[in-house]
């Protein structure tokens, strides 16, 4: 790509060059073994759709609506929201798209009734009357409500983005098992997408930035790239939490901001309360945890000095067990953690525990440089993003873009891995 741009997979490409082996992905429904022939994406909705006049009332209207918009609209149980297929992806109906669709269905019913009237006056008059009734707001609402139960018109919230081996990107979907770019399909149920395209291109400006932040330390650069690659996979096999530590003007904010923009819909920014120690009797709602469902990158920015970590929360967030949490005034929901938490802070947090369960999860990434005077570029982030549009690329080995610490866990002697001796002293 021109100007050394990175579209999302440079992160993966460089991680691969650090070496890895493919992980033992669990099988999920909808994961294609290779690249199967993709069914055609839904085309434009026809203004005419035949009506089964042998059926009656709201049930007929709902089935007519479902027939028109099968593969184009989905109701999400749990969210109580509709999704619509927009060009090449599912998006939430946040501008009344489902209302517009049910109005189109009512109009199509009138078109069919008018054709009946032209062919048979007696039969057509009754159908015109029913089509007119279908245009009322009460009938439109009833149509939408009953359509939720029609086959293929709804899914559970947990069904969305449920396959961690599929990664939505700007120009399709990447099968992380093979590094193959595929066209997005409605049946993949992908609603999240990275902030840039998949492409294969070198990324010299990003590599230069990494060399400036970690000068002369290729081992750390390689480890960071593996960490970034691992984060994109949605795996929780390593049970790690990354702490980017160092005082200001050292590149860590730019590093983190670019990471958030790259991961796009898979990224969440959480408040420091996510990790702050709480009273043992504090059972209040944890919206800061509930909001993380479906994320792959969770960023926590700037812990207060002297903050003690909530060690049970760290173990849960950097663990493999399902997490239960709720928003205020909402019921609990349970989900599997598919994210890696990255913390940016000037101060090392306080960890009072001495057990391996907490310390083996901590990965410390030190930012030791300080860029001052002529070394500081206030436009660097814009340059990195504008000229380095990240991509998910694969090298000549065509292996899955999964970071490897060893097999796909921490390598022995990895400079980013916290150890009981070096970090507890």
Where do the PLM segments sit?
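Feature primarily recognizes SF3-like P-loop helicase cores of small DNA viruses
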Residues: 41-77, 110, 114-425
């Amino acid at each position: 790509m021109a100007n050394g741009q990175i579209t999302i997979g440079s992160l993966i490409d460089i991680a691969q060059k650090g070496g890895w082996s493919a992980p033992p992905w669990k099988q999920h429904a909808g994961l294609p073994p290779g690249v199967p022939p993709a069914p055609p994406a839904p085309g434009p909705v026809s203004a005419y759709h035949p009506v089964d006049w042998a059926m009656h009332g709201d049930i007929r209207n709902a089935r007519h609506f479902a027939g028109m918009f099968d593969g184009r609209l989905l109701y999400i149980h749990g969210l109580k929201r509709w999704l619509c297929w927009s060009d090449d992806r599912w998006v939430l109906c946040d501008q009344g798209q489902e209302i517009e669709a049910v109005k189109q269905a009512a109009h199509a019913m009138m078109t069919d009734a008018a054709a009946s009237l032209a062919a048979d006056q007696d039969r057509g008059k009754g159908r015109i009357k029913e089509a007119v009734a279908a245009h009322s707001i009460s009938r439109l609402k009833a149509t939408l409500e009953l359509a939720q139960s029609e086959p293929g018109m709804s899914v559970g919230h947990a069904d969305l983005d449920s396959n961690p081996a599929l990664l939505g990107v700007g120009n399709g979907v990447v099968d992380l098992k093979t590094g193959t770019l595929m066209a997005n399909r409605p049946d993949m149920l992908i609603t999240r997408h990275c902030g840039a395209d998949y492409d294969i291109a070198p990324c010299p400006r990003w590599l230069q930035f990494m060399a400036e932040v970690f000068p002369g330390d290729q081992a750390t650069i390689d480890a960071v790239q593996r960490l970034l690659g691992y984060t994109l996979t949605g795996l929780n096999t390593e049970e790690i939490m990354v702490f980017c530590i160092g005082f200001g003007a050292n590149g860590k904010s730019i590093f983190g901001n670019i990471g958030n923009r790259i991961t796009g819909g898979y990224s969440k920014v959480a408040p420091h309360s996510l990790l702050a120690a709480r009273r043992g009797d504090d059972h209040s709602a944890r919206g800061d945890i509930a909001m993380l469902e479906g994320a792959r990158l969770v960023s926590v920015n700037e812990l207060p000095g002297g903050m003690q970590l909530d060690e049970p929360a760290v173990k849960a967030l950097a663990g493999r067990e399902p997490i239960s949490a709720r928003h205020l005034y909402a019921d609990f929901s349970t989900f599997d953690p598919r994210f890696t938490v990255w913390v940016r802070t000037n101060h090392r947090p306080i960890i009072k525990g001495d057990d391996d369960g907490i310390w083996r999860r901590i990965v410390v990434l030190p930012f030791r440089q300080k860029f001052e005077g002529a070394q500081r570029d206030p436009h660097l982030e814009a340059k990195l993003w504008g000229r380095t549009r990240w991509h998910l690329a694969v090298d000549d080995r065509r292996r899955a873009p999964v970071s490897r610490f060893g097999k796909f866990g921490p390598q022995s002697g990895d400079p980013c891995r916290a150890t009981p001796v070096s970090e507890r002293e």
